[in-house]
Structures are given as structure tokens and as C-alpha cells.
Amino acid sequence: MNINTILFDLDGTLINTNDLIIESFLHTLNHYYPNQYTREDVLAFIGPPLRDTFEAIDPERVDEMIETYRAFNHAHHDALVKEYETVYDTVQTLHEKGFKLGIVTTKIRHTVNMGLKLTKLDSFFKCVITLDDVEHAKPHPEPIEKALACLQAKPEETLMVGDNHHDILAGKHAGTKTAGVAWTIKGREHLATYEPDFMLEKMSDLLSILGVTSR
């Protein structure tokens, strides 16, 4: 397989922000709708842009709810974000082997930078496409197409890695190969229904898929 470019989603793929996201949603929703939302209820909100989620809940309060969410999220970011096993070493190895690495996320750039700095992944990526950079978020192909242009990469030589069906669909729409991650909070079986080309049990599985020997 001739893959020289790897694009990653951020949340739930490279860094474990599940607790942070869930607590941010629960804090926000309980503020406006006390005791109406549970942890299970907000799992469906993980992945899409905040604006899409809050518009479906309360179109009149979208900006206010986003502000409440982000204030809590930023205040608790470093305490609640965790690392996934083998991610750092795998990304470092791919970087050292000369793969072109990018991130495609539906987060705003400020929060993306917080996560990358905290996990010390920030030096490995030549291109980071955030919600601030696009008109259409995943599953639209625009974010991936922008990353490909940024990295001067071809879709047929690129692998998109993500924990959400939006990542898999965006990759398919843009013509890349796709890999799901089995540690997705929505469940391996759910992600498998979108038929990614590969399913990673841990991030280091990428190395064997790509024929790369670790350091």
C-alpha cells in the first residue's frame, strides 16, 4: 500500500478528551435544562460542531450555549484530558520516518493548540485544519481536501484516521483510505458499520499496516 500521508482526527483519536467533552456538555445543558440530560444522552453530540448540536437543541441560545461550553471546557481542559496508549511513540516514529502528518478536527484552533501542547504532539504535524479554517465541517470533504493541499498530498496516498463516523465518511468523500479506532467511545461495532478500510486496536497498529518498523 503506497501511503505517505496520515491525517488524524484529534478528540477521541489522538487525545482522550471524552470526559472533558461529556462534562462540558452536561455542565452546559444542566445550566439551561436542569436534570434533563444524562451522560448517555450527550454521547451523540461528540463529533459534530458545537453549533450544529446546540442549534438542534435551542436555536435562540446557540451562541450563549457555545460560550458556556467553551468556558467550562477551557477551565477544565488540562485536568480532564488524558493520553491514549502508544499514540505519542507511533506519531513520533511516523514523523521520523518521513510521513506527512496532519490533523483534521471540528474544534477551534485555540482548543486544538491546548491539547497538542499538553500532550507534546505539537511538533509532529505540518498541517492542522480546524473548524476556523473551513466553511463545511466533516463529513464534508472540504477539511480533508484543505489538508491534502496544505501537505501537497494525493488522496489515494493518504490515510484518514478517526474515532467518529464523520471521519470515515469525510475520508471516503475525499477519496482517501480510512482507519477507524476501536477505542471510540461510541463503540467499535458502531464505527465498523461505516466500513473503514482498517480498524486499529491501538495506534501502534498503524506501523504494521504501513510496513514501518518502530524505533
From Swiss-Prot:
Entry GO MF terms: inorganic diphosphate phosphatase activity; magnesium ion binding; phosphoglycolate phosphatase activity
UniProt cross-references to Pfam families, sorted A to Z: HAD_2
GO cellular component, as recorded: cytosol
EC number annotated for this UniProt entry: 3.6.1.1
Catalytic residues in the record: 9 (nucleophile)
Needed cofactors: Mg(2+)
Reaction(s) catalysed (UniProt annotation): diphosphate + H2O = 2 phosphate + H(+)
Enzyme kind, highest EC tier: hydrolase
Glycosyltransferase is among the record's keywords: no
InterPro entries: HAD-like_hydrolase_sf (IPR050155), HAD-like_sf (IPR036412), HAD-SF_hydro_IA (IPR006439), HAD_2 (IPR041492), HAD_sf (IPR023214), PGP-like_dom2 (IPR023198), Pyrophosphatase_Ppax (IPR023733)
GO biological process, alphabetically ordered: DNA repair
Function field: Hydrolyzes pyrophosphate formed during P-Ser-HPr dephosphorylation by HPrK/P. Might play a role in controlling the intracellular pyrophosphate pool.
Family from the record: Belongs to the HAD-like hydrolase superfamily. PpaX family.
Name assigned to this protein: Pyrophosphatase PpaX
Gene designation per UniProt: ppaX
